[in-house]
């Protein structure tokens, strides 16, 4: 009978390498049995294939043909593994792991894995030419060990040539091409048994097929992939430990359906009793004075803080594609409000550093650690962006990029690795929870210490509002002030949203002691904890808890202790979410979509390692006694994410770039109305599904970033519906300005100017030669944005304008307008070292351009002086005296 698992592809003999087939015996109950998705066609059923076979015989007339089998190829319907299959496989792999764990060197480990039943069977059934193949490839002992680990883990199909695994796809259209492809499989299955002696084939290759240079490259890349898994997941047993964890989680998932959930949860968390409570929070909306004080602690502690960005996610839901190349792009490259999301993060950080300079007169450059991945060339895109923007005027030494490994995607049915082609498993990033171990492995913690840092703020790239007003500064300030280990920024949760919740965990351990701490439960685990994701009106339990936003403060030393753990603790809350479809193209370009997932862990669940122990059960308030805490603010000041593409014909704008823009506009409305500026209110999202927003307002964060600071730069006026206000400037004064149309102010030196460091890199010097703009009693009237244009993309800040009033300030240029109406289209471009004044004249505008005097070149003719007054910041506009 033809082997159902050996279907090599036929290649030309030149410049190819012979490889092997795998003839694993399968049975309907075999845990790792692999099947064709559909029956293969046979030679006997196709005259065209018979004729082609005769041609092949004529071309090979110098070669002896042993025999050709026309027996139908075996085909079996995939059978989902039963519980016993999982348990027996888990037991086998755990036994193997324990033996490997006590083996002190590679030689001993190799001896252990050679004794594994799967490995023995594999090499005994594929002994022909294997050693020669591996020798030709130049595999060293470690690479051979990795290959054996894959086999021992039951994933030898990742090494096989040209067969398909059955994952039970629900719907698949069988094309003529697919049928022909299957027929070719059968043809080649027979041809492989020929005794070939022509040029390029030496000797009898009864079990051989060939690899071309591309496939050899895939194999080499596959070895690198395996080595990264083996090294990074060493804390759980490498490749084999990864598969054990996958199978255990799948088994738990099936067991959960038939077992008391609370018992399962308590068993998995290793405790006798577990209860979740609604956590107490530090509500920044109710305690404004305390919020101001906490934010000041955050500013004051900026020299002790680092910044961490986990950017490694695949962001598949965003569907971002380069319009020119067609390449899939990572979320960090999404152009939102005129700049990439990564640029937005750095701009927010620089705004806080600018505020620190204005208060204390000192430069402060925060070191930034960025976790990337190979998904969608994430690492290359992020690196290139940083280089192109000259490291944002911060110097390359203040950035540390570290790349997370990719992990194999697995079938939801049986935990088998999903393979798109030989040596190419479908792979995804292993979740942002790998960041702590990876940071330790890559020396990121020591790098932060070398920069004198004690703590760090963590935010995700898709959240565009996390730095609004006091949220981020208060979070960090409280963590530093009270030596906390971990803090969460939280808010009200939107029912049904794909976001987790923060909870207060109460556990009774088997030793009789009690533990308490703030934790997070991801939405994918609501079912595990028996939490309903219904709307509040349906009394869903999730409505009682605040949202987890993945905005964190972390004590670096505490995080390092967890990341350096030599066990599973370094990978917090490992989960296997198999409720999504894995989509991929095979080597023939055929599309596949299967239910699956990958082993991932959650960054925020490092909190589970920071619980506080008590000898007895606690009652009443615990906040002061815990190492974990929550600050709480209005949702649109905490989280609004651009993480998924707006669905067609859908009214759901939540977590889309469109919805994120609306929240930015709502924040702008809240801020400016507090400054006595009249403007229309932003309505609910569903109002703007098919309509543009009522206006476009984008403000540079360095105008604050604290709203207490921003409010002192704006006073009175109005912004009409269908108007636009964009301010790319920090030194700005607005007094009774009316905008009916478009007003754009852009300062080249919004926060300062750059000077070269010792390496010749441009470094931003805050407060040096800033561009400045004053608008007092000014009316701006023009036709503004063409709101009827079909090509406008408002969230991208890509709009067509009919008219605008645009002020461009080069270098330290200044612009002043007072008691004037600026009507129609105008572009005022002020050169470096000059001031442009506009007032009313007899025949319209009176325009006066004059050079700045030498004594005010650095400071400007005026500036905002920031002074601390208790827990508040007071601004005073200072005119610089000139001789």
Curated annotation (Swiss-Prot):
Provide the alphabetized UniProt keywords: Chloroplast, Nucleotidyltransferase, Plastid, Transferase, Transit peptide
Q: What is its EC number?
A: 2.7.7.9
Regulation of this protein's activity per its record: Inhibited by pyrophosphate.
Transit peptide interval: 1-72
Q: Recorded GO terms, molecular function? A: UTP:glucose-1-phosphate uridylyltransferase activity
Where found, per UniProt? Plastid, Chloroplast
Q: GO biological process annotations for this chain's record? A: sulfolipid biosynthetic process; UDP-alpha-D-glucose metabolic process
Q: Which cofactor does it need?
A: Mg(2+)
Induction section of the entry: Induced by phosphate starvation.
Gene Ontology CC annotation, any one: chloroplast
- Quickly give the catalysed reaction: alpha-D-glucose 1-phosphate + UTP + H(+) = UDP-alpha-D-glucose + diphosphate
PANTHER family linked to this entry: UDP- GLUCOSE PYROPHOSPHORYLASE, UTP--GLUCOSE-1-PHOSPHATE URIDYLYLTRANSFERASE 3, CHLOROPLASTIC
Which family is this protein grouped under? Belongs to the UDPGP type 1 family.
What function does this protein fulfil? Involved in the biosynthesis of sulfolipids in the chloroplast. Catalyzes the first committed step in sulfolipid biosynthesis. Converts glucose 1-phosphate to UDP-glucose, the precursor of the polar head of sulfolipid. In addition to glucose 1-phosphate, can use galactose 1-phosphate, but with much lower activity. No uridyltransferase activity with other hexose monophosphates. Specific for UTP and cannot use ATP, CTP, and GTP.
What name does this protein carry?
UTP--glucose-1-phosphate uridylyltransferase 3, chloroplastic
Organism expressing this protein natively: Arabidopsis thaliana
Gene name? UGP3
């Amino acid at each position: 009978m033809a082997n159902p698992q050996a279907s090599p592809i036929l290649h030309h003999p030149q410049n190819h390498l012979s490889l092997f087939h795998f003839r694993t015996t399968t049975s309907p109950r075999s845990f790792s049995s692999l099947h064709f998705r559909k029956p293969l066609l046979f030679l006997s059923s196709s005259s065209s294939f018979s004729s082609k076979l005769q041609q092949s015989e004529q071309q090979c007339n110098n070669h002896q043909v042993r025999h050709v089998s026309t027996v139908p190829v075996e085909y079996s319907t995939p059978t989902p593994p039963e519980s016993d299959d999982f348990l027996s496989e888990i037991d086998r792999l755990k036994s193997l792991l324990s033996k490997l764990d006590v083996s002190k060197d590679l030689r001993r480990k190799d001896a252990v894995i050679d004794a594994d039943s799967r490995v023995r069977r594999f090499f005994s059934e594929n002994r022909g030419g294997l050693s020669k193949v591996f020798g030709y490839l130049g595999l060293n002992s470690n690479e051979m060990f990795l290959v054996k680990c894959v086999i021992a883990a039951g994933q030898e199909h990742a090494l096989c040539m040209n067969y398909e695994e059955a994952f039970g796809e629900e719907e698949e259209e069988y094309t003529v091409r697919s049928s022909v492809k299957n027929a070719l499989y059968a043809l080649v299955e027979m041809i492989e048994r020929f005794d070939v002696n022509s040029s390029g084939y030496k000797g009898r290759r009864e079990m051989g097929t060939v690899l071309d240079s591309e496939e050899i490259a895939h194999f080499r890349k596959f070895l690198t992939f395996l080595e990264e898994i083996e090294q990074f997941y060493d804390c759980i047993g490498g490749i084999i430990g990864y598969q054990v964890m996958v199978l255990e989680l799948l088994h738990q998932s099936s067991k959960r359906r038939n077992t008391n959930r609370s018992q399962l949860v308590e068993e998995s968390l290793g405790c006798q009793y577990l209860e979740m409570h609604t956590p107490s929070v530090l509500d920044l909306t109710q305690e404004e004075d305390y919020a101001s004080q906490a934010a000041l602690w955050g500013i004051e502690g900026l020299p002790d803080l680092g910044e961490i960005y986990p950017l490694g996610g695949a962001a598949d839901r965003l569907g971002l594609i380069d319009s020119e190349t067609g390449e899939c792009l990572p979320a960090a490259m999404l152009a939102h409000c005129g700049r990439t999301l990564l640029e937005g993060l750095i701009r927010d950080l620089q705004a806080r550093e600018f505020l620190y300079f204005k208060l204390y007169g000192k430069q402060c450059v925060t070191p930034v650690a960025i976790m990337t991945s190979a998904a969608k060339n994430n690492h290359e895109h992020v690196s290139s962006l940083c280089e192109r923007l000259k490291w944002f005027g911060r110097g390359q030494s203040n950035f540390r990029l570290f790349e997370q490994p990719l992990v194999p995607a697995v079938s939801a049915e049986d935990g088998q690795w999903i393979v798109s082609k030989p040596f190419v498993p479908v792979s995804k990033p292993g979740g942002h929870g790998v960041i702590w171990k990876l940071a330790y492995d890559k020396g990121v913690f020591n790098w932060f210490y070398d920069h004198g840092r004690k703590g760090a703020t963590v935010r995700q790239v898709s959240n565009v509002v996390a730095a609004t007003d006091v949220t981020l500064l208060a979070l960090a300030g409280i963590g530093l002030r009270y030596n906390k280990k971990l803090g969460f920024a939280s808010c009200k949760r939107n029912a049904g949203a794909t976001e987790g919740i923060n909870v207060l965990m109460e556990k009774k351990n088997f030793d009789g002691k009690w533990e308490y701490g703030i934790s997070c439960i991801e939405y994918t685990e609501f079912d595990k904890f028996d939490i309903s994701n219904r709307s509040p009106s349906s009394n869903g339990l999730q409505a009682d808890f605040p949202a987890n936003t993945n905005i964190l403060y972390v004590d670096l030393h505490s995080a390092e202790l967890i990341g350096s753990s030599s066990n599973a603790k370094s990978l917090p809350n490992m989960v296997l979410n198999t409720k999504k479809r894995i989509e991929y193209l095979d080597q023939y370009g055929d599309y596949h979509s299967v239910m699956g997932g990958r082993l991932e862990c959650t960054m925020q669940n490092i909190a589970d390692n920071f619980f506080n122990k008590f000898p007895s059960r606690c009652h009443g308030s615990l906040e002061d006694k815990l190492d974990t805490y929550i600050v709480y603010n209005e949702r649109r000041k905490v989280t609004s994410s651009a993480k998924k593409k707006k669905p067609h014909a859908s009214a759901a704008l939540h977590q889309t770039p469109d919805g994120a823009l609306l929240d930015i506009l709502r924040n702008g409305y809240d801020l400016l109305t507090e400054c006595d500026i009249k403007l229309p209110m932003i309505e609910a999202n569903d109002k703007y599904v098919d309509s543009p927003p009522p206006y476009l307002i984008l403000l540079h964060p360095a105008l604050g970033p604290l709203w207490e600071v921003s409010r002192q730069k704006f006073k009175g006026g109005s912004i009409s519906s269908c108007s636009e206000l964009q301010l790319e400037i920090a030194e700005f004064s607005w007094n009774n300005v009316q905008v009916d149309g478009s007003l754009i102010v852009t300062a080249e030196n919004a926060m300062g100017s750059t000077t070269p460091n010792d390496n010749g890199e441009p470094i931003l010097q805050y407060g040096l030669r800033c561009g400045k703009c004053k608008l007092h009693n000014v009316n701006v009237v023009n036709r503004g944005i063409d709101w009827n244009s079909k090509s406008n993309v408002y969230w991208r800040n890509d709009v067509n304008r009919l008219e605008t009033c645009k002020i461009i300030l080069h270098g330290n240029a200044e612009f002043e307008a007072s008691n004037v109406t600026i009507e129609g289209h105008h572009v005022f471009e002020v050169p470096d070292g000059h001031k442009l004044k506009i007032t009313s004249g007899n025949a319209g505008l009176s325009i006066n351009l004059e050079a700045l005097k030498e004594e005010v070149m650095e400071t400007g003719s005026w500036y905002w002086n920031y002074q601390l007054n208790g827990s508040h910041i007071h601004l005073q506009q200072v005119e610089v005296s000139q001789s």
